[in-house]
């Protein structure tokens, strides 16, 4: 279910403060955050945000195609190891 337009996008206040500080100082270091639920705003374009995936912080470079999505969409939490090969096909 989508968020109501009258409410606007959700962004954690501490993340917004860090982004504003990085923009003001022209800092290129990644911004660490645990806020996977925050929406990507146009102010974030060009910054690298390290999003926590439960184990490590995954660096995500924000481009204009990502605006409107959530940060957690770009930091995968599960590792796909692949399906096992069919044993019948291996024998032949």
From Swiss-Prot:
Function: Protein S19 forms a complex with S13 that binds strongly to the 16S ribosomal RNA.
Gene Ontology terms: biological process: ribosomal small subunit assembly; translation
Keyword terms of this UniProt record: Ribonucleoprotein, Ribosomal protein, RNA-binding, rRNA-binding
One term under GO cellular component: cytoplasm
Protein name, UniProt field: Small ribosomal subunit protein uS19
Keyword NADP applies: no
Lineage, uppermost ranks: Bacteria, Pseudomonadati, Pseudomonadota, Betaproteobacteria, Neisseriales
Similarity comment text for this entry: Belongs to the universal ribosomal protein uS19 family.
GO MF, any single term: rRNA binding
SUPFAM superfamilies: Ribosomal protein S19 (SSF54570)
